[in-house]
């Protein structure tokens, strides 16, 4: 789809290799080994104009972001049910790294030029729970789950989803990235980004015995759940902030 191709340049992870690594899980962390700053950005355009926002971003942002060592990843996808809405999982080394990115001359140009096409923008601060991915690869199929968990079950749910998502990236060569975040203001609300090699890889994972076990184990903990599907994606995995592990 043309809009996806245009917006792929806005997924500014640094002009990375597109070869696929063997099955392994590698966390995104700061140089000190801590979780980085994570947030979700929800960008909504006026009707039919998300592609124009993507064109602006592709023109003014990539060269600057590539030089920002603290801008780890900007993984963006377009909702299937609302192609005027893009969700980005943004990962920065620190608050200072985010400040550098958001106040750069290139970003200010992008923000000014997109204004005429922008219907809404929401930033959601979250804490990283699982930030695991392959060393390299290109994800074509992405899903988000929004889970609202019973307060008494938050710790257990976090333990189970962390173990399963880490296992999936570590053992399955077609699961490219698994990300779990919890809202800072509502720590019982979790948002995921699940990145797969392609649609077949996603279906295979969803039909796996391990994933079905995860569903059974967490069913009673979930108060509400929403699944968000996206148009075909082109997420190039970042290398910034990725701690390469040979064996985990």
Language-model-derived ranges and their functions:
Residues 1-11:
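Bacterial N-terminal signal peptides that target proteins for export
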Residues 9-19:
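Bacterial N-terminal signal peptides
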Residues 25-35, 75-84, 109-148, 176-189, ...:
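Glycine-rich beta-strand-turn "strand-cap" elements at beta-sheet edges
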Residues 26-100, 161:
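Ordered, small/hydrophobic-rich secondary-structure cores
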Residues 43-48, 92-93, 148-152, 196-199:
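Structural beta->alpha junctions
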Residues 49-71, 106-109, 153-176, 210-214:
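Short amphipathic alpha-helical segments
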Residues 51, 93-105, 155, 198-208:
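Short amphipathic alpha-helices within nucleic acid-binding modules
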Residues 138-198, 204-205:
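Conserved small-residue-rich
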């Amino acid at each position: 789809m043309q809009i996806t191709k245009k917006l792929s340049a806005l997924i500014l992870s640094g002009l990375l290799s597109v070869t696929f690594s063997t099955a392994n899980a590698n966390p995104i962390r700061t140089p000190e080994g801590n979780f980085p700053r994570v947030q979700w950005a929800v960008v909504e355009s006026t009707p039919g104009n998300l592609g124009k926002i993507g064109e602006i971003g592709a023109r003014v942002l990539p060269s600057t972001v590539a030089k920002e060592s603290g801008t780890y990843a900007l993984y963006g996808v377009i909702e299937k049910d609302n192609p005027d809405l893009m969700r980005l999982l943004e990962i920065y080394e620190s608050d200072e790294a985010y400040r550098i990115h958001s106040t750069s001359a290139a970003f200010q140009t992008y923000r000014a030029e997109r204004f005429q096409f922008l219907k809404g923008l929401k930033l959601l601060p979250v804490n990283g729970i699982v930030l695991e991915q392959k060393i390299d690869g290109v994800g074509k199929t992405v899903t988000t789950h929004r889970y609202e968990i019973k307060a008494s079950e938050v710790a257990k749910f976090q333990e189970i989803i962390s173990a399963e998502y880490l296992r999936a990236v570590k053992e399955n060569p077609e699961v490219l990235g698994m990300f779990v975040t919890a809202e800072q203001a509502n720590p019982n609300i979790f948002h995921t980004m699940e990145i797969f090699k392609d649609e077949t890889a996603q279906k295979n994972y969803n039909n796996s015995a391990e994933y079905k076990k995860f569903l059974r184990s967490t069913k009673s903990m979930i108060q509400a759940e929403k699944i968000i599907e996206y148009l075909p994606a082109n997420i190039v995995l970042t290398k910034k902030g990725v701690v390469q592990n040979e064996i985990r």
